[in-house]
Amino acid sequence: MTVNSEIARRVRDLDADSTETAEDAQHALTAMGPDVLDDVIAAVPGMGRFGQLCAIEIFTALGDPRAADILISLLNSESDTVRQWAAEALGELAVERAVPALARAYEAFRQRGESPDHSEGEGIRWALTRLGARRVVLPPRSAALRVSSGDEAYPLWPMVHLSEIVEDLAAHSQAVLYFQIWQIGTDGRRFWHGASDVDWDLDRSWTWDRNVAHCRDWALLAAEAVDTAPGLVASISWIGATDL
């Protein structure tokens, strides 16, 4: 079998009924390197949801900007997961020209009335932040208490400071959506440790100040009930008024 025919076979397998077959194809194509990109890009429009997700992972892993146009087109997918992953890939690949399309995708997300903590909204906001098109309000005190995460768009804080950070963000008119708890391994990688059992929502019929206070109070209640052992850190998701 020639290399070209092997690439073609693996690309077809990305859209296989079996997710195991599709994932095997994804890993094989990634291992083949940039030579597979043109074939994968050409096949993406005809793929189903899972095949497109596998393709997005290939594009991200290879880090090749040739995938930019197809990723931008996927921001219009009927699948919210495909839209989210495409947005995140554009951020990962530092595709600055995708900013207008990402802004339109986020406006469409807002117009649908989705909860701001929905994963699609999170992904698009992260991409816009990564590309310098969204300003995150991070108060000086909160910034000073951060621990290094390797990603300025994804800060982490020691759990012992969680309540203080929630208060600080609210004092600067930021609404805390949720937080998650992580364990940092000896190699610097983070491992999910848990999340709060308390959920809360914003209400678009309320004033922004009322939403901020509501989120602060629930986040503080949630913070009281979680593990604050040494070595644990928190990631916090928050938004400003223009994000709602």
Region annotations inferred by a language model:
Residues D117-V136:
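Eukaryotic acidic, Ser/Thr-rich intrinsically disordered low-complexity regions
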Residues D17-S18, M47-G48, E78-S79, F109-R110, ...:
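Short inter-helical turns and helix N-cap capping residues of alpha-solenoid HEAT/ARM repeat scaffolds
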Residues T2-D13, P34-P45, D64-N76, V95-Q111, ...:
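Amphipathic alpha-helical scaffolding segments comprising HEAT/armadillo-like alpha-solenoid repeats
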Residues T21-A22, Q52, R83, E114-D117, ...:
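Residue-level detector of extended alpha-helical repeat arrays and alpha-solenoid scaffolds
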Residues C215-L244:
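Amphipathic alpha-helical binding modules
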Residues M32-D35, L53-C54, Q84, E152-D201:
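Amphipathic alpha-helical interaction modules
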